[in-house]
């Protein structure tokens, strides 16, 4: 017979493991399912897009796509989104954008992917143009495989539009503050399970023993899963609008108050803010350094993955495994990150990310630069060759850098805003989002693409020493910024405590 004490213990344990009340499951579970489907597509797209571009165009093309196609496309997509919001209800905007992605996936799956010779220009023409105009050869090669470039762009936009914008806007609109404290952490845990699930799906359908479709159409089942997943997102969203938003226990427009708009700053105002406030400048430097250092290692790593796994199928299966490890490591860091922040100083917690990046980056580049020496010493000790070891260390570096991003890096960055006065906190955060966000995400790609334009004879093999040098300079600047910010942070914290 259960005692009241044991009942209380079980009740508290349930709240820790599953902090959702029974009646809230009607709201929470469909939202979690929507997020799972969106992230299932996102992680599948991330694996496939690189497989197509890296093996058919070249790893060098990724930096050009990010800089000259994805970035302008994201701006155009946001302009279209704002226009749609002016003329349609929010619910219909969601249907239009999701249906657009669904339609593109269907077009790619059944027209562009199965018939590349019909939609792409003659390869000989592309090659002759590349030789005639070497400084623009990567632009020409991208045009030569334009359908894969469009797929890469749509894959990037899926994450921006469907997850960052539409899902979280819907979640923020219908979730009360007390619900958000319990719902959002659970969303993070459940969402990261989509990554290992993606790995299993990719591994099964692209395995050489799986013979569902013709060999040259191996990716079609994955596209069908993405189309089905997109359709389920639309159905779930519609069901929630009809059944959850009409339930007064779960949604009351009067209680879900309109949130104050974030301070938005122009590019010029953001630069002024960062150059006039040393404190805000340090925070921006953290974000820029993280984005550039990740991109510099990632580009070189993907070129090495292509050497080890030269076919689309093998490359995509490997990237699926990468998603598997990334998902579990992200969950682990989410669970232990808060404990680290409670037990160590801000400086120690903030220093973990750049030091981890420095150590793993140094190991990765060492295996590339000294591959013959390493091969000589490790022959007979390890079954893997230096290329496989370099790829493995590159994967570890990427997994850890993305794992710490959402737990330690973002947490320490956001903690740094707390001691600032309200005006500087709001404006400073807006300035950092504009400068740090833009230059962090595209900085590495701009460096790489500019290098390949100026030195057309270079690929990643020849350019790696230069990118490695830039990487180490950036990480050292990052460590300097953390130390500088810590001094300023401690002064402000001590002031507020007094």
UniProtKB/Swiss-Prot annotation:
Cysteine disulfide partners in this protein: 37-85
Segments crossing the lipid bilayer: 34-54, 68-88, 93-113, 148-168, 185-205, 219-239, 280-300, 321-341, 349-369, 380-400, 439-459, 466-486
Residue intervals annotated with topology Cytoplasmic: 1-33, 89-92, 169-184, 240-279, 342-348, 401-438, 487-498
Keywords: ATP-binding, Cell membrane, Disulfide bond, Membrane, Nucleotide-binding, Transmembrane, Transmembrane helix, Transport
Entry GO CC: plasma membrane
GO MF term list: ATP binding; ATP:ADP antiporter activity
Topology with respect to the bilayer: Multi-pass membrane protein
InterPro entries: ADP_ATP_car_bac_type (IPR004667), MFS_trans_sf (IPR036259)
Residues that bind ATP: 436-442
Extracellular side: 55-67, 114-147, 206-218, 301-320, 370-379, 460-465
Compartments, record wording: Cell membrane
Family to which the UniProt record says this protein belongs: Belongs to the ADP/ATP translocase tlc family.
Task of the protein: Provides the rickettsial cell with host ATP in exchange for rickettsial ADP. This is an obligate exchange system. This energy acquiring activity is an important component of rickettsial parasitism.
Protein name: ADP,ATP carrier protein 1
Organism name: Rickettsia felis (strain ATCC VR-1525 / URRWXCal2)
Source species taxonomy: Bacteria, Pseudomonadati, Pseudomonadota, Alphaproteobacteria, Rickettsiales
Gene from which the chain derives: tlcA
